[in-house]
Amino acid sequence: MLAGIREILIIAAIDETPKCERLLGDGSQFGLKLSYAVQPKPEGLAQAFIIGEDFIGDDSVAMVLGDNLFYGNGLGHLLREAAKQQNRATIFGYYVENPQSFGVVEFDDDGVPVSIVEKPKHPKSNYAVTGLYFYDNRVVEYAKSLKPSKRGELEITDINKIYLENGDLDIRLMGRGFAWLDTGTVDALLDAANFIKTVERLQGIKISAPEEIAYNMRWISKRALLESAEKYGKSSYGQHLLSVAEGRILYTSNDISGIGERPRWGIESEQEKH
């Protein structure tokens, strides 16, 4: 949403897709248009572009993994810059202590990326590729051209390699102040929950609220925001939406993008959370 994207295809396993649809509906409450598709078998991240070919059409596309959490002041600006790129791909690197568990970017002495290796035994850097990707329309044909890896999957790393070899890959590093949490394990999910709890307790506001982002992007009206607040009642989430609607939350102007943020007391901005 912070990238300015309003049409979203949610791809999930056959038993999970109906649950997602019941939870999120058509997305109109967020000013979005949501569609749904099934991945019959877990045959790799790159398969998403084949499944979503009709949805993508002639457009460029972004993909984010559903079990990844990103947080940081300036995130929206980073995403919008990536979305503006034409005839290129953008991925994001993040410093980790266990690069063996991720796709890893190798850099030359000048900091230029020279290779990407999936879960290397002997990683040449500590920068992992996060679960957030922006591609031009060529990604669909690139995905179709892939052959399954040894583990029987169409690897997203192989798509990134194609863009890298063609000189069409940008790698943006998420530095200090950004948090990336991959919640693919029980322990990691607990870490993410505790992180969110801590940040929300310290700040006194929600780490992310789709209705809030939609309102600041001018995708939904104040009346729609108040209706959502009423839906959640006296819960902390409902009260947060009410505070947004009543203008009680100030926003910093660190990452102004000029794509429709509502001014608050002469300060233009948005909530830099995804």
Per-region residue spans from a language model:
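Short, amphipathic C-terminal "tail helix"
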Residues: 219-220, 225-265
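Catalytic-core segments of class I nucleotidyltransferases/pyrophosphorylases
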Residues: 62, 83, 112-212, 223-224, ...
